[in-house]
Amino acid sequence: MGECPVNHTKSANVAGGGTRNIDWWPNQLRLNILRQHTAASDPFHKEFNYAAAFKSLDYNALKKDLTDLMTNSQDWWPADFGHYGGLFIRMAWHSAGTYRVFDGRGGGGQGQQRFAPLNSWPDNVSLDKARRLLWPIKQKYGNKISWADLMLLTGNVALESMGFKTFGFAGGRPDTWEADESAYWGGETTWLGNEARYAHGQEGIAGKGIVSGDESKKNHTDIHNRDLESPLAAAHMGLIYVNPEGPDGNPDPVAAARDIRVTFGRMAMDDEETVALIAGGHTFGKTHGAAPADNVGAEPEAASIEQQGFGWSNKYGSGKGPDTITSGLEVIWTKNPTKWTNQFFEYLFKYEWELTKSPAGANQWVAKNAEPFIPDAYDPNKKHLPRMLTTDLSLRFDPGFEKISRRFLEHTDQFADAFARAWFKLLHRDMGPRSRWLGPEIPSEVLLWEDPLPPLDHPVIDNNDIAAIKREILATGLAPQKLISTAWASASTFRGSDKRGGANGARIRLAPQKDWKVNNPAQLAEVLGALEDVQKRFNEQATGGKKVSLADVIVLGGVAALEQAAGVSVPFTPGRTDASQEQTDVHSFEHLEPYADGFRNYGHGNDRVKTEQYLVDRAHLLTLTAPELAVLVGGLRVLGANYDGSDHGVFTAQPGKLTNDFFVNLLDPNTEWTNVDGKGEVFEGKDRATGQKKWTGTRADLIFGSHSELRAIAEVYGSADGQEKFVKDFVAAWDKVMNLDRFDLEQGAGSSPKL
């Protein structure tokens, strides 16, 4: 029984108010992330097709309107230096920069900067104003441009309006309509805290999240060697990447470089891309720290209703323009902050730097023995000394970063090219394959991080060919469960977060996937060898230029085996192609390897995450609903698809047949379960009356009888009339997973992305 969670404050006594289940049982398995971004929250009907709407957009007119906005300063939020470029670059960067490679979550693909918690992060102070400046343009073009696309395109246009040649831009990011609860942003409960993500981190502040000038006075013990918790890519709760004052506010550029390298690396950036992004972004605009943070009001989610979504009201002076407080730092990097120059590197290496304080009390650096020549953002008669952030100096004082920075100083063309490419990658890393990309500015050069696929340059197989290939596959003598396991292993790498993985490309035959333990490499090699022979024979005999890819044959093998096991027809859509090893970034794909995969009874939980939580996490990446999760696990078990061929969860007397036996036997009240491994991971089911052993199962199996919501679903499939529905639903869910990465089949359908 849970302990009383009442905190003696009165909650709203209306629908949705009061003590919730999570208050009573905070460790309860939650399925909420499997119910997000559905039609219930989407104001558009299913008929709305964002890709079609985007194609009807007057793209050039939109870009002109955005360009005009850059210098159309508004009295309610005036533009620094008469140009909003720096603000909009930051908006785009902070939208896309939440991406992390470990699970593909974050990024700009959902337009989540509009929602909590991102809209109220300390690092996003004043971006509420940036989005409001954009509203008249969004209002004008309506559904033809999503917020997700508009925020990133605006950053691109900002760069172009200040003389920078960008690498290109692709649209195609449908909006979502609610806060995404799937991303783990950290376990801290105060802004700027990091005590949960680092072994010796610090608690944050209870205020509004502006940089504290006193932060660096804390005791810091591990800033030169600490390890950031996975999957996080930010050093503090509420920051996009690192503390600009230095680790935990400590103004140490070398230690800051370590944090930079880790966090940018977890956003899929290497050292050159990291240096280019920091220096390129800091070529423009300024930071804002006109006065201490105690002048700043509540963030948007905590602000009063009359603020209408604005936050961080500022009582210092006018509260805007020269009196703006954003980060608490007050730095203008270059003499020409509204133009593309190489001045960031010129000043970085020209001057020696000494530590100083911003008007808000934050640590920053000022050039020694320099004359004031940096322009003021609002007073043409006022000049400033050159200033830098601790994290800027990291690009000079870290040996690896310094080498790149000096090269960029001497070769401005290399700097411009590196920044253009890194910026494009930042904005598009979670876009998925090019079949999702829209617009007239898609670059012709194909980049390795796109996980490129060869084009489909031949006629695809027809129904007669499909039937013949299925017969050939079954004639190989491969056990059906091996064919099903291989097809599932190939397709289930897909991540709806960043649209990576999936069966298309047949990358399961390439490094690193071919060697993953979860894929049972010995069995995989056997199956792939036989399927490659089938593919080769067909392609040698086919006429009219017709071919079949191994990617298609792998999926077709699973389909053939499933049809044999279920006695029903299973859909199949050809058209996949085969990627090469040269088109596959091994290091990047290593992040797709599962730590635990409950669908195949692989791996288990730890002292932080339970096995069943990993299962739900994986189901979310596969864009599954709770019923789809249940029916797939139940079906894969009776089909014998455990990664190692074990009997765990195979609750049937007729393995290999697609029956609802998993649910029937799991729900049998005559079975008594006990833990047998001493770790709470493996269990044995015995007949209550005789004590005879009947089954073994894992947490990923027993959760469907233990968890009240999953049990409710299991009871549907385990009922006397559940078999027909079970088979129908399993086949539908199977087909969905096999085609998760086939954006070429129905490009852009629906207003919401596959999440």
Curated annotation (Swiss-Prot):
EC number: 1.11.1.21
Stored PROSITE patterns: PEROXIDASE_1, PEROXIDASE_2, PEROXIDASE_4
Enzyme class: oxidoreductase
GO MF, any single term: metal ion binding
Record's subcellular location: Cytoplasm
Superkingdom as given in the UniProt entry: Eukaryota
Catalysed transformations (reactions): H2O2 + AH2 = A + 2 H2O; 2 H2O2 = O2 + 2 H2O
Pfam families noted in UniProt: peroxidase (PF00141)
Gene3D superfamilies: 1.10.520.10, Peroxidase, domain 2 (1.10.420.10)
Keyword RNA-binding listed: no
GO cellular component: cytosol
Active site: H94 (proton acceptor)
Job of this protein: Bifunctional enzyme with both catalase and broad-spectrum peroxidase activity.
HAMAP family: Catal_peroxid
Family as reported in the entry's similarity comment: Belongs to the peroxidase family. Peroxidase/catalase subfamily.
Assembly description: Homodimer or homotetramer.
PANTHER family for this protein: CATALASE-PEROXIDASE (PTHR30555:SF0), HYDROPEROXIDASE I, BIFUNCTIONAL CATALASE-PEROXIDASE (PTHR30555)
Protein's name according to its UniProt entry: Catalase-peroxidase
Organism: Podospora anserina (strain S / ATCC MYA-4624 / DSM 980 / FGSC 10383)
Lineage start: Eukaryota, Fungi, Dikarya, Ascomycota, Pezizomycotina
Gene encoding the protein: katG
